[in-house]
From Swiss-Prot:
GO terms, molecular function: NADH dehydrogenase (ubiquinone) activity; quinone binding
Function as written in the Swiss-Prot or TrEMBL entry: NDH shuttles electrons from NAD(P)H:plastoquinone, via FMN and iron-sulfur (Fe-S) centers, to quinones in the photosynthetic chain and possibly in a chloroplast respiratory chain. The immediate electron acceptor for the enzyme in this species is believed to be plastoquinone. Couples the redox reaction to proton translocation, and thus conserves the redox energy in a proton gradient.
Gene: ndhG
Subcellular location(s) of the protein: Plastid, Chloroplast thylakoid membrane
EC number of this enzyme: 7.1.1.-
Organism: Fagopyrum esculentum subsp. ancestrale (Wild buckwheat)
Name of the protein in question: NAD(P)H-quinone oxidoreductase subunit 6, chloroplastic
Amino acid sequence: MDLPGPIHDFLLVFFGSGLILGGLGVILFTNPIFSAFSLGLVLVCISLFYIIANSQFVASAQLLIYVGAINVLIIFAVMFINGLEYDKNLRLFTLGDGMTLVICTGIFFLLITTILNTSGYGIIWTTKLNQILEQDLINNSQQIGIHLSTDFFPPFELISIILLVALIGAIAVARQ
């Protein structure tokens, strides 16, 4: 999406905040239903990032597959699990949680500083060659094939890893 700079930056911050808050909700909510809805918020924010990055096909695939199918499946699986009783004396924040919070926060800030200091940060990846190639292709399926095998290969690989982790988590929950 070709937006003016300030609007683009505002949307990035807004969707990034939704992504971070949704991720914290997945981790911190003790109710699995609330965690599943927070996961839905995370997946929607990721698809909105793809829309901002001019990847409408990847965004629609993200919405249809992950939010529309996988997240709904997780919510139904959690709802059909025989009533887990939560301990009333459950301490919400333990020493291990604090250590994990400190380590994860440190890793987060390390990644942010690494990304900002990388020489490839801020490069516009769309080139004139890609635009000329898109004009030469006959139909949309050829364009989608070229983009999936070149430009959007890393996002789809990351999406497949997320799907694998979600399936392993669903199997672990189902076995309990």
